[in-house]
Amino acid sequence: VVGGKPAKLGAWPWMVALGFHNYRQPKKSPEWKCGGSLRISRHVLTAAHCAIHRSLYVVRIADLNLKRDDDGAHPIQMGIESKLIHPDYVYSEHHDDIAILKLEKDVSFSEYIRPICLPIEESLRNNNFIGYNPFVAGWGRLRYKGPLSDALMEVQVPVVRNKVCKRAYSDVSDTVICAGYPKGRKDSCQGDSGGPLMIPQESTYYEIGVVSYGHECALPKYPGVYTRVTSYLDSFILPALKK
């Protein structure tokens, strides 16, 4: 996350870090290189471009600082039983960048760990979210080509009309949602991929996007691009959660 601030303990109890093997140093602890969000009991929603790697093998749920044990968080680390990648996703392209991980076992919810809601209600399902200022959170880079963050960071970015977003990225379609400021400065970045774009409604958070791609990070006129969750509810997400 670029231009954000450290998240407070318990702010995002559905945040998941995705851990990858480093094959060159197999004894090393996981490399936390993507994000995701907890769904009911044992599934994680993330980006296909994260899930597709064979080196992905573990998740850590509801951590705050990935390197410290004294941050007050009570994270759970768990293996992955199976991965469901959107059938139309192609690694060299950006479309249909969505996947669901099924965990080895059910996650017990607590004050620290709970799932984020899907935008299933009509008022959300048919919303393009223009005028909203959603949050994005992750352990990704603090600037383009900069270091990954050990601390969970958060930032708010305004939703941009797809027409405007198309000026930056020609392949933008209705199945994505773009967010960022005209002057840049605040954005998700590499390592935040798969994490949630979130809006509060009353006191409940809903996930409206999944971090997908962007040109570098936080550049003027180049918003971040997110997979639009409402576009995939019936065709992919809800059926995948039954598996």
UniProtKB/Swiss-Prot annotation:
Q: Which GO terms describe its molecular function?
A: serine-type endopeptidase activity
EC number(s) per entry? 3.4.21.-
Question: What Pfam families has UniProt attached to this entry?
Answer: Trypsin
The record's subcellular locations are:
Secreted
Q: Which GO terms describe its biological process?
A: proteolysis
* Keyword Protease carried by entry: yes
Q: Which catalytic residues are annotated? A: H49 (charge relay system), D97 (charge relay system), S193 (charge relay system)
Boundaries of every Peptidase S1 domain copy: 1-243
GO CC aspect terms: extracellular region
Q: Which domain of life is it from?
A: Eukaryota
* Cysteines joined through disulfide linkages: C34-C50, C165-C178, C189-C217
Q: What protein family does this chain belong to?
A: Belongs to the peptidase S1 family.
Instruction: Report the protein name in the record.
Output: Venom protease
- The organism encoding this protein is Bombus pensylvanicus (American bumblebee)
Provide the organism lineage as a comma list.
Answer: Eukaryota, Metazoa, Ecdysozoa, Arthropoda, Hexapoda
